[in-house]
Amino acid sequence: MTDHKKLERVLKATANRRRFNILAHLKKEKELTVGEISEHINLSFKSTSRHLSLLFAADLVEKTQRSSEVFYRLGDNLHPTVLEILKHV
């Protein structure tokens, strides 16, 4: 994938206020379950899960399954643009 395509995908994923809030919470908390994230952003579990799927597809978050719960954290290789934006939250 070209750098321009990747940047476009990243910017589209972060352009949504709810997804941006998810990234901001993950920056502070390091790792959260879908349920914990949905409580933080006042959104249903299902909608939160959908937003997390989009962030995962854009390589902005990583997930780990432990027992019956999925834990999300910021990706290790975040795009420099996202890192710069997250410095200000």
Where do the protein language model's features map onto the residues?
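Key DNA-contact positions within bacterial/archaeal DNA-binding proteins
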Residues: 46
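A short acidic, leucine-rich amphipathic alpha-helix
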Residues: 36-38
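Short capping segments at the starts of secondary-structure elements
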Residues: 17-20, 29-33
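Short, Lys/Arg-enriched N-terminal segment that forms or immediately precedes the first helix
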Residues: 1-11
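Short, hydrophobic-biased segments on the C-terminal half of alpha helices
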Residues: 52-53
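Conserved segment of winged-helix/HTH DNA-binding domains
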Residues: 2, 28, 69-89
